[in-house]
C-alpha cells in the first residue's frame, strides 16, 4: 500500500530548489473560486426600490467555501462566474443581488437587518407584498420606530388633514349666499328708509321689492300681465318676488295715509293692513317705495332751473298698452283745462 500512495505523496512534497516558484503566499493567499450561489457583487448599493427577479434556489455550496470564514470585502472581481444571469443593465444587476442576499440569510451575519433597510428605501406597502418577506421582529425597536415615525405615520395624518380641509371648503360656500342676502336686505332697507324711520326696521330685513305704486294702476287694469310675469319667472327658474296687485280702493287709502304721515309705527301699520286686508310686509314695502318716489320728486324740484319747487309737481304714471291714444289725448286736455 505504501508503494501505491508513493507517487501522490511525492507530488504533495515541495521541491527544495524551487522556493521562488512555489511559496506559501501563492498557495494560501489566492482567493477561492467564487461559487455561483454565494457570489455577491458589492460595487453598487445592495437594496434599491426595484422589484427583484425571482431566481431558482442556488446549488449547494462547496465544502471548502462553507468551512472557510467569510472574507473581508475586496474590490469587485469580473463577472465570469455568473453565466447569463446578469444583464449589462444596472437595475437588473442590483435587483438580482438583493434577491441573492435575501435568499441566503444563514451564511452572512449582516443579512437580517437588510430587509428593514430595503423597506426604508422602497415605497411603503409594496416591498412586503411583492417579495413575501416576514415583518420585522419586535426586537429591532429603534429601526421600527424610525421607520414608522418617518415613513408610514404621516400618510394617514395627511389624509385626515386633507379631508378636514375639503369638508371646510365644501361647507363654507353654503352659508355665504344667506349672509350676503341678509346684508343686501339691510342695506336696501337702510337706503329706502331714512334715519328717521325707526319703526319700519323693527321687523327685520325685508327683500328688495319692486315698486308697486309705479305700476299699481297697470296691474289693477291688466291682471293677466302679473300671471304672465309669474309664469315667466317660473319658466326661467329664478325665484322672484311676485308683484302685489293693489286695488283702487287700497291705493286710495294708502295714498291718504301717506299724505297724512310719511312714516308709520308698528301699531299703525298693523291697523292699516287689517283694514285693507293686506299683510304688514306689503304695507311696509309700499310705504318704502312711496317714500323713495317722494324723495326723488323733491330732489328733482330742488335741482330745477327755476330754483324753487313748483306747486304742482308732475308724477309720471305708467299707462297700460291697451289704452287708446284718444283717451290719452282727452286726459291731457282735461289736465290742461284744470290748470288756472
Swiss-Prot record:
A GO BP annotation: branching involved in blood vessel morphogenesis
Positions with biased composition (Low complexity): 226-235
UniProt KW keywords: DNA-binding, Homeobox, Nucleus, Transcription, Transcription regulation
MF GO annotations: DNA-binding transcription activator activity, RNA polymerase II-specific; DNA-binding transcription factor activity, RNA polymerase II-specific; RNA polymerase II core promoter sequence-specific DNA binding; RNA polymerase II transcription regulatory region sequence-specific DNA binding; RNA polymerase II-specific DNA-binding transcription factor binding
SMART domains: HOX
Region Disordered, annotated ranges: 106-155, 167-242
Database matches in Gene3D superfamilies: Homeodomain-like
InterPro entries, per the entry: GBX-1/2, HD, HD_metazoa, Homeobox_CS, Homeodomain-like_sf
Any single Gene Ontology cellular-component annotation: nucleus
The entry's DNA-binding region: 239-298
Biased composition (Basic and acidic residues): 172-189
Compartments reported by the entry: Nucleus
Biased composition (Gly residues): 138-152
SUPFAM superfamilies from the UniProt entry: Homeodomain-like
PANTHER family cross-referenced by the UniProt entry: HOMEOBOX PROTEIN GBX, HOMEOBOX PROTEIN GBX-2
Function recorded in the entry: May act as a transcription factor for cell pluripotency and differentiation in the embryo.
UniProt protein name: Homeobox protein GBX-2
The organism of origin for this protein: Gallus gallus (Chicken)
